[in-house]
Amino acid sequence: MSTYLIGDVHGCYDELIALLAQVEFDPSTDTLWLTGDLVARGPGSLEVLRYVKSLGDSVRLVLGNHDLHLLAVFAGISRNKPKDRLKSLLEAPDADELLNWLRRQPLLQVDEEKKLVMAHAGITPQWDLETAQQCARDVEAVLSSDSYPFFLDAMYGDMPNHWSNELSGLARLRFISNAFTRMRYCFPNGQLDMYSKEAPEDAPAPLKPWFAIPGPVSNAYSIAFGHWASLEGRGTPEGIYALDTGCCWGGELTCLRWEDKQYFTQPSNRQKSLDEGEAVAS
């Protein structure tokens, strides 16, 4: 009975299946955690969604910004970009079933026994766990309702970038989705910076990676996240696990077995890209 955490799959179905075979994943006894961005850029987004959905209770995932963008395309709000390679998914006979399943997935996973939290981009240091859980529920409730297109239409934007319990309506939901799915850097007070994407050693002062600013959640829990492929899984404090290692850019798909903290990797089938590129809706 093992727990396997895998970084952003981005439609890299063959690599996902190879990595799961490498660790001898058994869905009848093991649990798979996925950091989000299941889709886009790789050639197998349709196959990834079908497979992950088939795992049922054996998988715990969170939504990423590419997953949200796919839902916006599905709802007719955003256009499908050829580089995302989503055409076969959007035209599949089971697209409605898959995407209505996807929009009912969470933004946050918490395991109190393991003292483990997972979100696609991380947890803003401005939140304690109770606030993070409530904020996740706020967006999840809208996404799973019939009014989800109204949120998806309003989610694109960088403001507000500072948390307050006084935030309400679509502005509140936009901050929450940005914090869970797009965040990289923060100012020392925890305010989000939505523009900088360079490596931490090149980031302009006073910006810091969100995980370099102590917060109530990181002080009490381990945090697993994806989203930030250019970190290449390095440079995080103890207890913070960066799992996106850029498989869709020619890097690797990374798996962490939680029980013994052993890492496994599967090389990408694609040529290494020098440009990580810009994530859609980021």
UniProtKB/Swiss-Prot annotation:
According to UniProt, the reaction catalysed is: P(1),P(4)-bis(5'-adenosyl) tetraphosphate + H2O = 2 ADP + 2 H(+)
Q: Which GO terms describe its molecular function?
A: bis(5'-nucleosyl)-tetraphosphatase (symmetrical) activity
- Disulphide bridges: none
Top EC class for this record: hydrolase
**Alphabetically ordered keywords of this record:** Hydrolase
**EC number annotated for this UniProt entry:** 3.6.1.41
Xref: NCBIfam families: apaH, PRK00166.1
Protein role: Hydrolyzes diadenosine 5',5'''-P1,P4-tetraphosphate to yield ADP.
Hey, which family's this protein in?
Belongs to the Ap4A hydrolase family.
- Protein's name according to its UniProt entry: Bis(5'-nucleosyl)-tetraphosphatase, symmetrical
Q: Which organism is it from?
A: Klebsiella pneumoniae (strain 342)
The beginning of the lineage is: Bacteria, Pseudomonadati, Pseudomonadota, Gammaproteobacteria, Enterobacterales
Q: Which gene produces this protein? A: apaH
